[in-house]
Amino acid sequence: MVGRLQGKVALITGGTSGIGEATVELFVAEGAKVLIVGRNADKGRTMVSALGDAVRFFQADVRHEDQIAAAVADAAATFGRLDILFNNAGGGTTGGVTDFTAEQLDDAVSLLLGSALYGMKHAAPVMKAQGWGSIINNSSVAALRTHMGGYLYSIAKAGVTQATKLAGMELGRHGVTVNCISPGGIATPIFFGGSDRAAAMAEGHLEASMAKLERNLAKATPIQKSGLPRDIAAAALFLASDEGHYVNCHDFVVDAGMTAAGRNNFEAVA
């Protein structure tokens, strides 16, 4: 089925790489107009050149509320509406209970949690005025189980999951659904920012490290397959489409059974 987002307008943060890039490409293929939000202007221009008039790039750092507000305003002004918000931007964090810095804490909270809160804050009025909208937040299995992510990362993502449910309760009466996706082991370069061990694994050998990551992630799931960005993009497509209209306040876990498999399987990843 093609055209599941025909006539819809989406804003996707972190849209120039990994899950975000895959989602932009899928949404465009399904008929959407997309505002790509990200910091990498060169990559943004490349994507606009490749995808044409269906997309527009807006350079922004989602850790700052004024920049998110400007992106939402740009989407509404350019396309005349905003049907879908995918708060996808994120990154890995390091540090444990006793060895994180104030800067690391601020960065984790502002990037992983604050960006989603600001996105919802500024998109919600536009969607409420329309009487419809779909907000999707990118959370993580690290919000559900221990040993699935770093200390600060896991805490921030748990906040994203809870904020999703609270926002869905508040906005549902206005025709706006709010859901989150909790990816399991998805093979993207962003993985290597999640721990010192993982970063060392990738240093200077990203292509080989990605191949190794995919093999190791496959071992952590019952179906023996690594997740790829397009798997999360497909979940976002369902939630954003009319087919997902009855889903609200839901945490859509896309992990091939990783959380069921448990700690020992995941610890083999890196």
Question: Which stretches of residues belong to each language-model region?
Answer:
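Alpha-helical segment proximal to the catalytic Tyr-Lys
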Residues: 125, 169-170, 245
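Short, small/polar-rich loop/turn modules that mediate ligand/substrate recognition or access, typified
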Residues: 172, 177, 247-249
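Substrate-binding pocket helix/loop in short-chain dehydrogenase/reductase
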Residues: 96-97, 104-109, 135, 217
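Residue(s) in the substrate-gating loop at a strand-loop-helix junction
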Residues: 140
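C-terminal substrate-recognition "lid" of short-chain dehydrogenase/reductases
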Residues: 79, 117, 132, 223-254, ...
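Active-site helix of classical SDR
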Residues: 120, 156, 164
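Conserved glycine-rich cofactor-binding loop
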Residues: 16-17, 40
